[in-house]
Amino acid sequence: MAKLVFSLCFLLFSGCCFAFSSREQPQQNECQIQKLNALKPDNRIESEGGLIETWNPNNKPFQCAGVALSRCTLNRNALRRPSYTNGPQEIYIQQGKGIFGMIYPGCPSTFEEPQQPQQRGQSSRPQDRHQKIYNFREGDLIAVPTGVAWWMYNNEDTPVVAVSIIDTNSLENQLDQMPRRFYLAGNQEQEFLKYQQEQGGHQSQKGKHQQEEENEGGSILSGFTLEFLEHAFSVDKQIAKNLQGENEGEDKGAIVTVKGGLSVIKPPTDEQQQRPQEEEEEEEDEKPQCKGKDKHCQRPRGSQSKSRRNGIDETICTMRLRHNIGQTSSPDIYNPQAGSVTTATSLDFPALSWLRLSAEFGSLRKNAMFVPHYNLNANSIIYALNGRALIQVVNCNGERVFDGELQEGRVLIVPQNFVVAARSQSDNFEYVSFKTNDTPMIGTLAGANSLLNALPEEVIQHTFNLKSQQARQIKNNNPFKFLVPPQESQKRAVA
């Protein structure tokens, strides 16, 4: 009973923390940016089953946005070891499919191994029970709250590529602004430790040698003594050494290869799961509704359990953790000649309200343009998934702080209120944009419903020193709201 009360208290406390999390303000002058660059990863850490690449979080644009960015590649049968971070995370699946799990303290283990028939003379083996496992596929956005441990596994031939950000400016991060990943197992190199030590300034030769040793990394369990681990887990010394990672090769790293594949209790795929859910909903609709105390009326399944629920289990332990915004999803903005945009905010993906983050997937056809626009209440971290685009960014002084190409695999950070416009240079430019607000808003400067379109004609005329007819053209010539087709397409449409 005491254990149950503790769990409920923890869940209530966690729910409150997640729900009211916000962001700290960047330090003074961190957003006084005169020049932006399209950045590629500058650190690469190879493991047995894949690799992890990171961008330097000490770069000024990352400091301004208050985020850290990394990219993980998992080969066939590769398992990314469980870890948690000091800030909330968003993970976008650029390629591949597989399974992942999260471990919420206080939530029940609902996946249970089937009971095996016991042979005569054999001792019974405890059934494996664990928390829920989820499928993921290309285009999925995965929400990971602060301090929640998660793992990921690739059970297909195609390598999994996952891009993720950590919000280090979140108020849930009670440490400094440096991203930190806490691994539960292994002796892998910490992907952000290098930058943490660089931030400390120049070191002596002795200090550099010590840094190289520290960069070898380790898990949180490797720091405890054998005696403590034996006592805590009730295991012998040999198992305790394995918990420390003492008997492990240095080349395994944060991503290990599971020989023969991972055998766990996992959910059906999306295709297998869709039809049973539809049939169950149809059965619920066909059942009669009970009124009053009619004992002969058959109540719908789950009605009794629903009446006993207190809401905690639904808001934390069973919340939806992934949401697809890729090419296969229904776009929020669509122009057949220009492209499409799909967003994920806390309005359609409630888990994001705990992270205070959101994301946007966009696809632009060749020479199509996303009109000049700005984020009212968020920084934008734009990662190019495919193709290339010409992008211009302007700051508050009217200076072009970026005027160049954003190519596949590179990232461009656009601070809040900086104005950005993009035009695709390839047949299909695709990007994902992480935003530091769960309900981001954008304002467009051109096209229908834009700022200039909403101004009175005479205000435009006198503001820009134009003739009346010219002001009217600015207001009415572009009928598109966000995405503008190539100019030749517009000319053909007018003709």
UniProtKB/Swiss-Prot annotation:
Any Pfam family: Cupin_1
SS bond list: 31-64, 107-317
Entry PTM: During soybean germination, seed storage proteins are hydrolyzed by protease/26S proteasome.
Tissue-specificity statement: Exclusively in seeds during embryogenesis.
Propeptide: 307-310, 491-495
SUPFAM superfamilies (alphabetical): RmlC-like cupins
Documented applications: Emulsification efficiency of glycinin is improved by degree-dependent glycation with soy soluble polysaccharide (SSPS) at 60 degrees Celsius in both the acidic (A) and basic (B) polypeptides as a result of subunit dissociation at the quaternary level. Thermal treatment of soybean seed proteins leads to the aggregation of glycinin acidic and basic polypeptides (GAP and GBP, respectively). GBP improve sensory properties of meat (e.g. pork) during chilled storage and inhibit bacterial growth (e.g. L.monocytogenes, B.subtilis, E.coli and S.enteritidis).
InterPro entries noted in UniProt: 11S_seedstore_CS, 11S_seedstore_pln, Cupin_1, RmlC-like_jellyroll, RmlC_Cupin_sf, Seed_Storage-Functional
Signal peptide residues on this chain, from the entry's feature table: 1-19
Domain of life the protein comes from: Eukaryota
GO MF annotations in UniProt: nutrient reservoir activity
Subcellular location: Endoplasmic reticulum; Protein storage vacuole
Record domain Cupin type-1: where: 36-241, 323-472
Bias (Basic and acidic residues): 268-277, 287-297
Keywords: Allergen, Disulfide bond, Endoplasmic reticulum, Seed storage protein, Signal, Storage protein, Vacuole
A Gene Ontology cellular-component term: protein storage vacuole
Motif annotated as Vacuolar targeting signal, chain positions: 486-495
Keyword Endoplasmic reticulum: yes
Family affiliation: Belongs to the 11S seed storage protein (globulins) family.
Subunit details: Hexamer; each subunit is composed of an acidic and a basic chain derived from a single precursor and linked by a disulfide bond. Interacts with the vacuolar-sorting receptor VSR via its vacuolar targeting signal.
Function: Glycinin is the major seed storage protein of soybean. Glycinin basic peptides (GBPs), and, to a lower extent, glycinin exhibit antibacterial activity against Gram-negative and Gram-positive bacteria (e.g. L.monocytogenes, B.subtilis, E.coli and S.enteritidis) by forming pores and aggregating in transmembranes, leading to membrane permeability and, eventually, cell death.
Protein's name in the database: Glycinin G1
